[in-house]
Curated annotation (Swiss-Prot):
Record's function text: Transcriptional activator involved in cell elongation. Regulates the expression of a subset of genes involved in cell expansion by binding to the G-box motif. Binds to chromatin DNA of the FT gene and promotes its expression, and thus triggers flowering in response to blue light.
Protein name per the record: Transcription factor bHLH76
Keyword RNA-binding: no
Gene designation: BHLH76
GO cellular component terms given for this protein: nucleus
GO biological process: positive regulation of flower development; regulation of DNA-templated transcription; response to blue light
Source organism phylogeny: Eukaryota, Viridiplantae, Streptophyta, Embryophyta, Tracheophyta
């Protein structure tokens, strides 16, 4: 026996089996008013006659007239879930949504059956057991395709195009997606190239990059301006101070001989210091020389005046000496002596020298007169002479 004969025998067994042997596991597969509403229109429609198609197919191939009676309805369908899933997967209603809608419209199948069959479909990745029912579902699918092809030939060849669309739908979707992705990538690359080539975009980018940097530079410039103002004020004060110093240095240059020829402040200061040191040495040398020539320079004027007063009261002085050194009372009356000590201190240098020289010359004259006369004057004469005013 061939495969088709085995399939026909198995088909008969399935048809002749009672419904009670298959307990309804799924409540959707049991007899219901919804199924009863379209069972007669689906299976007993004139346009959807499986009996005639099966007879013609079997007669053409094996010359065996095996009638396929489809008198059973949806309620007589076995409640095996595996069989239902396999039949739904390999049925011609699973070829695609477009093909199913077209077949339903051409065969007059109501929309409820399409919904029912879509709900009963299983995912493509589920594993199915190989068995005789798979062969039956394959044959049913082939017959449905043949029917669709015959209908398309009778109508003008539209069915063949629909079948091709169903077969190439998956390939078309994948190719379209690839094309779209490729187009998107190309468009993005073109945009990038255009942006890179266009000078305006580059200018905008540079401007956008320069804006934050410009803000930072502005703040930096403000800080530099403030610091510059502070430095300017400080520099002005420094300039004024340096000008004053330069003026004083010029004054010192005028005082110090030979300092005009020197350039540079440091060298000029050295010259001034050397000149001051030389002056100090000269003053010390002169003071030492004066002390050697006149050892009694540091005498007190008051003690000297007291000594003069005591000497004027003594009888040993001659007439000339009394006139040279008058008493203190006479000096005070004539106004020669002033009680202001400050004026005396100013003239102390000249007075000291004059008095010392006069004292020494008078002493020398006194000694010479004593040697000539050899006699001392009387006290009365001296007093009389002192009373006489010139």
């Amino acid at each position: 026996m061939s495969d088709k004969d085995e399939f026909a025998a198995k088909k008969k067994d399935l048809v002749n089996t009672p419904v009670d042997l298959y307990p309804p596991e799924n409540p959707m597969l049991g007899p219901s008013p919804m199924m009863d509403s379209f069972r007669e229109t689906l299976w007993h429609d004139g346009g959807f006659n499986v009996h005639t198609d099966a007879d013609t197919s079997f007669r053409g191939n094996n010359n065996i007239d095996i009638p396929l009676e489809m008198g059973w309805n949806m309620a007589q369908f076995p409640a095996d879930s595996g069989f239902i899933e396999r039949a739904a997967k390999f049925s011609f209603f699973g070829c695609g949504e477009m093909m199913m809608n077209q077949q339903q419209s051409s065969l007059g199948v109501p929309d409820s059956t399409g919904l029912f069959l879509q709900d009963t479909q299983i995912p493509s990745g589920s594993k199915l057991d190989n068995g005789p029912l798979t062969d039956a579902s394959k044959l049913v699918k082939e017959r449905s395709i043949n029917n669709v092809s015959e209908d398309s030939q009778s109508s003008g060849g539209n069915g063949h195009d629909d079948a091709k669309c169903g077969q190439t739908s998956s390939k078309g979707f994948s190719s379209k997606k690839r094309k779209r992705i490729g187009k998107d990538c190309e468009e993005e690359e073109d945009k990038k190239q255009k942006d890179e080539q266009s000078p305006t975009s580059n200018a905008n980018k540079t401007n956008s990059e320069k804006q934050p940097s410009d803000s930072l530079k502005d703040g930096y410039i403000h800080m530099r301006a403030r610091r510059g103002q502070a430095t300017n004020s400080h520099s002005l004060a420094e300039r004024v101070r340096r000008e004053k110093i330069s003026e004083r240095m010029k004054f010192l240059q005028d005082l110090v001989p030979g300092c005009d020829k020197v350039t540079g402040k440091a060298v000029m200061l050295d010259e001034i210091i050397n000149y001051v040191q030389s002056l100090q040495c000269q003053i010390e040398f002169l003071s030492m020389k004066l002390s050697a020539v006149n050892p009694v320079l540091d005498f007190n004027l008051e003690s000297l005046l007291a000594k003069d007063a005591l000497q004027s009261s003594a009888p040993t002085f001659p007439h000339n000496m009394s006139m040279l050194y008058p008493p203190v009372s006479y000096l005070s009356q004539t106004g020669f002596m002033q009680p202001n000590i400050s004026s005396m201190s100013l003239l102390s240098g000249g007075l000291k020298r004059q008095e010392t020289h006069g004292y020494e010359s008078d002493h020398h004259n006194l000694v010479h007169m004593n040697h000539e006369t050899g006699t001392a004057p009387d006290h009365e004469d001296t007093t009389a002479d002192m009373k006489v005013e010139p």
